[in-house]
Amino acid sequence: MSPAVALTAELIRRPSVSPEDKGCLDVIGERLAKLKFNNERIDFAPVANLWAKHGTGHPVLCFAGHTDVVPSGPREEWQTDPFEPVIRNGIMYGRGAADMKSGLAAMTIAAERFIAKHPDHKGTLAFLLTSDEEGPSVDGTRRVMQVLEARPEKIDWCVVGEPSSGEKLGDTVKIGRRGSLSGKLTVHGIQGHVAYPHLADNPVHLLAPALAELATREWDKGNSFFQPTTFQVSNLSAGTGAPNVIPGELKARFNIRFSTEQSVEKMQATITEILDRHKVNYTLEWFVSGLPFFTAPGPLSDATQQAVKEFTGLTATLSTTGGTSDGRFIAPTGASVVELGVLNATIHKVNECVRMADVDTLVQMYERMMELLLT
């Protein structure tokens, strides 16, 4: 078993369901300390955070990731114990195997190999790790970046070890992410008897025309790097359960994944205009979980593509698809951000797994990126 695979297994054994870390940062921190990293814990209980640096000055190349995992789900649906790594036919099974304890192991072993060869590298090699990525994402990377900005400490390049690959390791590199705007909508009507609709005001009927317009609206056409903006209703509830009662209230949750063609203010104004025009009586709460970001071609994306090409033979597709990541908290500070990791086919699923060969290849790619950017 290679060092990276062994470390992946050691981390999987720690049931770090968000926001718990279960000692994962201690394991990684001890290895980094042996390399003479300056380790700083920036915890906001119960969230654990590690900011570790080797070297001084700029450029600062940061590897970022999270130790927390989503719950395993029903144990009986797993072929193996989700927190006891099992290897079958070159594949390791366990919660967090792909998302993203293999990524953490790969970047740690890559750092060990790189520093052994280049102890006096230029600039700074840094790690930013948290146990609050799968949860609210309030006291993790978001808060650590606030601390660093206040000092000020600036990251130049950041590699997020999220599982970015689709069919083959390295086939996809994320160079940005769409923004995420959510709304919590309450439509106020008047409850009544279904036989006397003139004495009531049905909130479902009030919202329906506006919702139809929102659901079919073309927000934009996207651009060469971003898909078009999308609007989706995620939750909708109204009524008492009785067949003869007009509901007095409707609650809805919706989400917009938006490109760089949009702004939060513009979308909020559009939605309120549509609701007002349809004379909907409502209250609306907004939640912005991240703004869109995009890393333009440059040293980081070049190094990433070169490393992928050298060790896989693939020309990586540069993509901004998928959900949000902690890159959304790092990019606004001016850092260039990419995401490169193992396959994402089984993340958040039962029987989550990772190919052991991919973990070792990821180590090689990460080490090569360190060489290209810090030597």
Language model features with spans:
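Acidic/His- and Gly-rich active-site-bordering loop/insert found
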Residues: 1-95, 115-122
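Short, small-residue-enriched loops and turns at beta-alpha junctions
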Residues: 14, 18-19, 133-135, 240-241, ...
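A structural signal for isolated positions on well-ordered beta-strands in alpha/beta enzyme cores
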Residues: 40, 124-128, 283
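Structural motif
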Residues: 59-62, 91, 126, 156-158, ...
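Acidic-glycine-rich active-site phosphate/pyrophosphate-binding loop
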Residues: 72-87, 155, 159, 176-186, ...
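Fold-level recognition of mixed alpha/beta catalytic cores in primary-metabolism enzymes, strongest
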Residues: 98, 102-213, 351-361
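Metal-dependent amide/peptide-bond hydrolase catalytic core
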Residues: 163-168, 175, 181-375
